[in-house]
Amino acid sequence: IVSRSPVPDETINEHAWLVDDKAGGLSPIRDRTDGQARILHAVISCKWTLRSDRAQNARSEALNLVRNRKGRTPHIMVVTGEPTPSRISSLALGTGDLDCVYHFALPELRAAVNAHGNADSNELLDMMIEGQRLRDIADLPLDLTV
């Protein structure tokens, strides 16, 4: 789970006057020092491999968070080391419950599939990457800045 704290008005108004006592008073990003909870920014599910039951767990975890949230929908992501593109696609090309699937060794997976995989595996892997449904783990911190 990745969360963030609410921000004081001084920080929000640092570069331009955006909020005061009359504007934006209900936004959860504003620190009102009344013991408000942290803001849920992202949920990252880590699955070493993706058998069908594990893939379904990641999807149902995401749906439960979305249904029970208050406020905006957090980023919902999966990190995996799954070596087969077909299993990765069960999540990456799913119903849109997840923002993205991240592979901890995507360059190595691409090289292995290019060297030893069949044409269908290569095409599936390329489709997930070009469609921005599968990314390398190095992209994850950058994607979390948004």
Feature annotation, model-predicted:
Residues 3-4, 12-38:
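Active-site-proximal segments of catalytic enzyme domains
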Residues 5, 48-49, 81:
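Histidine- and/or cysteine-centered catalytic micro-motif in compact active-site loops
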Residues 63-66:
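A short, acidic, amphipathic alpha-helical segment used as a generic capping/interface helix at domain edges
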Residues 9-15, 49-61, 72, 86-89:
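Active-site-adjacent loop/helix micro-motif of nuclease/hydrolase catalytic cores
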Residues 1-2, 40-46, 58:
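Conserved catalytic cores of phosphodiester-cleaving nucleases, focusing on short active-site segments
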Residues 68-146:
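C-terminal tail/extension regions appended to the core domain(s) of diverse proteins
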Residues 39-43, 70-73:
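Short, surface-exposed connector motifs at secondary-structure boundaries
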Residues 2-5, 105-107:
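Short loop/turn segments at strand-loop or loop-helix junctions that form parts
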